């Protein structure tokens, strides 16, 4: 079985993660004690349940999850929450001090003291796997623990399991809604790490999620619960092909191969259709064309970047439910033909589709969208501008240097982020003809040698 080991860190990561497990338990028919409920279920629920669960004694299913935080609060609320009993008690790893929204505390001081106990749990879980496919990490980049300790863990896992996939669900700071003043610092230092150590980053941000809740779901006062509901639907969609039988499968590695034309450009926008609010999973029966249309809609993207401002390098569409693959293919071709200016022409057929037969609970069919668009640079550019504004005056730096960080590290992170923006811009502007001329020149030089 191709197992995925799930890690959640910090307050944001733990809240998203616990929501995700509620969704996955629901899909696989696992109740709050970890037992499988057979009524109304089907064999397919158990067929590949090993991807996310370990089977323990007495027929209980235990999530392959590691939960970490530098303060006990969020963990305790998960533990006392509805699904708190299904996790392995040893897999809760937490400190008492908190990171105080300080990346340096998470990455170098407090987090570094706790990281070995987290890695022990990760190793134990990895040893329980038959054929570990990779890791998925939920965290935010604005705080201290998820960003600082999250990226520390990612780099440690990278060292120990270099050939396994590393997928992150990273919540970026929002443009208008700021939780803490030092978000731009924490986010830039984190991106510096993610560019090097992660294989695939799904970029999320609260503001875009709020917009979806307001505009599409018509919720007047969305809670984090509603936002996390959207994220968990997407997370479940990304891995459904591994967990349920399908006609066209995809896994984390296939996704990466199809989506990442250049190694550093692995930050994706995600979307989901049909969008339903948490309480009213209306029994909407959409058609494949409607799903496709909604999923490519800019309003559907879960990060604050507008795909119409850039071009898609690659994209992936994952459909769930009983549908004709021919229709799926036709729709995908249709999207590419109608919006050809939004796709780079030097990667032909750059949309991959996959179909999984089992839809999510209460839906006839659904689709998950993952796009590698150059417009994601808007997010990085925005954070980078805020970073530069503060860093120029060395504002708040003493909190970081006090934990032993060097200003040099800030400068490096800043230029790495700016390089990333420049790379996206370069490929956004690239056109097919120029590439050809370049290749011919290359060949001529080669002949001369």
Curated annotation (Swiss-Prot):
GO cellular component: cytoplasm; microtubule
Domain of life: Eukaryota
Protein purpose: Tubulin is the major constituent of microtubules, a cylinder consisting of laterally associated linear protofilaments composed of alpha- and beta-tubulin heterodimers. Microtubules grow by the addition of GTP-tubulin dimers to the microtubule end, where a stabilizing cap forms. Below the cap, tubulin dimers are in GDP-bound state, owing to GTPase activity of alpha-tubulin.
Record-linked SUPFAM superfamilies: Tubulin C-terminal domain-like (SSF55307), Tubulin nucleotide-binding domain-like (SSF52490)
Keywords, in A-Z order: Cytoplasm, Cytoskeleton, GTP-binding, Magnesium, Metal-binding, Microtubule, Nucleotide-binding
Signal peptide: none
Cofactor(s) of this protein: Mg(2+)
GO molecular function per UniProt: GTP binding; GTPase activity; metal ion binding; structural constituent of cytoskeleton
Chain residues that bind GTP: 11, 71, 140, 144-146, 206, 228
One GO BP annotation of this record: microtubule-based process
Protein name: Tubulin beta chain
Gene behind this protein: TUBB
Disulfide partners: none
Organism: Cicer arietinum (Chickpea)
Binding-site residues, Mg(2+): 71
Alphabetized PROSITE patterns for the sequence: TUBULIN (PS00227), TUBULIN_B_AUTOREG (PS00228)
Protein family membership: Belongs to the tubulin family.
Cellular compartment(s): Cytoplasm, Cytoskeleton
Subunit structure: Dimer of alpha and beta chains. A typical microtubule is a hollow water-filled tube with an outer diameter of 25 nm and an inner diameter of 15 nM. Alpha-beta heterodimers associate head-to-tail to form protofilaments running lengthwise along the microtubule wall with the beta-tubulin subunit facing the microtubule plus end conferring a structural polarity. Microtubules usually have 13 protofilaments but different protofilament numbers can be found in some organisms and specialized cells.
């Amino acid at each position: 079985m191709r197992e995925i080991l799930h890690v959640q860190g910090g307050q944001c990561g733990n809240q998203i993660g616990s929501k995700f497990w509620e969704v996955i338990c629901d899909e696989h028919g696992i109740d709050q004690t970890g037992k499988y409920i057979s009524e109304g279920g089907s064999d397919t629920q158990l067929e590949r349940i090993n991807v996310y669960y370990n089977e323990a004694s007495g027929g209980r299913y235990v999530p392959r999850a590691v939960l970490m935080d530098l303060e006990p609060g969020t963990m305790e609320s998960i533990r006392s929450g509805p699904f708190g009993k299904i996790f392995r008690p040893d897999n809760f790893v937490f400190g008492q001090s908190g990171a105080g929204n300080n990346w340096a505390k998470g990455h170098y001081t407090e987090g570094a003291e706790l990281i070995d106990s987290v890695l022990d749990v990760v190793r134990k879980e990895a040893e329980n796997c038959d054929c570990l496919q990779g890791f998925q990490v939920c965290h935010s980049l604005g705080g201290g623990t998820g960003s600082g300790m999250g990226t520390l863990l990612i780099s440690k896992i990278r060292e120990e399991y270099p050939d396994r996939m590393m997928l992150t669900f990273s919540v970026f700071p929002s443009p208008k809604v700021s939780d803490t003043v030092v978000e731009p610092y924490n986010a830039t230092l984190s991106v510096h790490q993610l560019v090097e150590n992660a294989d695939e980053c799904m970029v999320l941000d609260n503001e875009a999620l709020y917009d979806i809740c307001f505009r599409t779901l018509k919720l007047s006062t969305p809670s984090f619960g509603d936002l996390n509901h959207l994220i968990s639907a997407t997370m479940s969609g990304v891995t459904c092909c591994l967990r349920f039988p399908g006609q066209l499968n995809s896994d984390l590695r296939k996704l990466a191969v199809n989506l990442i034309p250049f190694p550093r450009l692995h930050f994706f926008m995600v979307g989901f259709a049909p969008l339903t609010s948490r309480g009213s999973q209306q029994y909407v029966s959409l058609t494949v064309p409607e799903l496709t249309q909604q999923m490519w809609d800019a309003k559907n993207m879960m990060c604050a970047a507008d795909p119409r401002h850039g071009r898609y390098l690659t994209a992936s569409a994952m459909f769930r439910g009983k549908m004709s693959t021919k229709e799926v293919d036709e729709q995908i071709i249709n999207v590419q033909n109608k919006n050809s200016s939004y796709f780079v022409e030097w990667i032909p057929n750059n949309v991959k589709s996959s179909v999984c037969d089992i839809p999510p609970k209460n839906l006839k069919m659904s689709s998950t969208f993952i796009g590698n668009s150059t417009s994601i640079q808007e997010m990085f550019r925005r954070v980078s501008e805020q970073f530069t504004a503060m860093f120029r005056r060395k504002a708040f730096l003493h909190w970081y240097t006090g934990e032993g960080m060097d200003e040099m590290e800030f400068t490096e992170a800043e230029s790495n982020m700016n390089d990333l923006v420049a790379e996206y811009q370069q490929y956004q502007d690239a056109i097919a003809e120029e590439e050809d001329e370049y290749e011919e020149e290359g060949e001529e030089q080669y002949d001369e040698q």
